[in-house]
Structures are given as C-alpha cells and as structure tokens.
Amino acid sequence: QVELVKLLTSPNPGELKVAYRMGLTAVFLPEFDVMMETPQNNPHHCCSVGEHTLKAIEAVPADKVLRLTMLLHDIAKPACRTTDKKGVDHFYGHPVRGSEMARGILRRLKFDNDTIDRVCRLVHWHDDNPELSGKAVRRAVHRIGVEQYPALFAVKRADILAQSGYRRAEKLAYVDAYEQMYRECMEKKECLTIRELAVSGQDLIAAGMQPGKQIGEMLNELLDRVLEDPGLNTKEQLLKIVTGKISDQNRS
C-alpha cells in the first residue's frame, strides 16, 4: 500500500507501466494487468483500458484519493465489456460494479475505511451526468453526497482528458456548467440534506404528528419538495405542508 501510494502521488505515476512490464502488478494488482490487456473499440477511446487509466491518473492533482480513484475508476470495464454487431465495445454498469471491486481491492491492500469509502463513492458516480437544471443538480449533490464535491469534477475532467478527442470540448463544457451550478447552489446555501431543512422531527411532533417512522418519511418528503423548489425551505411553509397532510389524514 505504502509503495503504491508513493508511486501514484509521485510526479511520474505513469511508472506504474514499468511495474506492469516487470511483472510486479501481477502480484499486488492483477486487475491492472487485465485492464492493460482490454481494448476499447469505441469512438470515445483510443487505447486499452489500462493505458486510458494511466493517462487519467496523470490528469488529476497528486492527491491520494484522487489518484486511487483514477486507478480504479474503470476497474470493472474488462468484466462489463460487450461488443455490438458493428464491433463497437460497450461497458454498461461498470461504475457500480467497479465501486464494489475497488472496495475489495482497497481492503486487500489494507487501506483505511475513510479512504476506501471516498474512493468507492467517486468510482460509483464518476459517469453520472445529471441534467443541467438547478433541481437536477441539487438532487445529484444530495444523492452522491456533498462531501464528494468538488473532487468529482476533477475525476470527470481527468476521465475526459484521457479519452480520445471525440466530442471532448462538448464533454468538458458540460462539466464546467455542472460545476458552475453546484457552486451557485453552495453560495446560495440551498438545502441539500434533511439536516438543513428549516424544520426538525421535534417540530413535526409539535405540529401534531405521532412519533415513529412517519416522521422520517415526512422529512424525506419535505426534502424532496425543497430540492425541487428551495424557496419552500422556511419553517412557516414546511409546517403548512405538514398540517395540510395531517388534516387530510384525519379526514380520511
């Protein structure tokens, strides 16, 4: 683990290829060897999964979590590879499966739980592209976890820069717009979690709700509405929704 991190965060992480040629990765990271031997016949790519991975590692800052993420972001591509009738390769489901594989690899290499969790979440979501609207971006940040930002943007850019030039400008423009919307959301301090709602479980009980799992369900419903329309996040408006629900239930 120590030697791998030292190599990945060095000025020359591409030296991993030397370790591959010497047969060293076959011992501690055999999954990397499989990536080196997996082609990507696809307009978005111009080299093997392994070569793409090496370029992606070099395209992120020399941070342990970011470089481990780029090392493992496409780890499941060999297992997920399918080829269509035209001879084009596809890798459906590789981010989710890759996240599971990354967890196993990082545990095997005895990384700490915090590093494992952060890397696996970034691997899981590296290909997620929400629609460029305020509500879609708020929902994405809520779903992915605010702590994965802004690292996720570095991951997405490195992935694009390590691909072929096909639609590169368009892909990078998308990430720029996504990041801009995320930053606006943070500047406005928009509510993204239950903790940031203007009401708490205690407020719902005080408004007449019975304690129990329905409190959690109601808070989730309120958050869903606030992600749609941040202007609703005032105590007055949220309690109005709650009391409306209570009177509806009492009527029925």
Question: What would you call each of these model-derived segments?
Answer:
Residues 7-31, 144-169:
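Structured, non-catalytic alpha/beta "coupling" segments that mediate domain-domain communication
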Residues 32, 140, 199:
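Short clusters of hydrophobic/aromatic residues that line enzyme substrate/ligand-binding pockets
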Residues 99-103, 120, 201:
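An amphipathic alpha-helix signature
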Residues 10-14, 51, 97, 114, ...:
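Generic recognition of short, well-ordered alpha-helical interface segments
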Residues 40-50, 54-58, 111-168:
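Histidine/acidic-rich helix-loop-helix segments that form or flank divalent-metal centers
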Residues 104-108, 163-252:
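Charged substrate- and nucleic-acid-binding regions of tRNA-handling and nucleotidyl-transfer enzymes
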Residues 1-71, 75-93, 97-111, 129, ...:
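Glycine- and charge-enriched loop/helix tracts that form the active or gating conduit
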Residues 65-66, 151, 192:
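Alpha-helical hydrophobic/aromatic positions enriched in membrane-embedded helices and signal peptides
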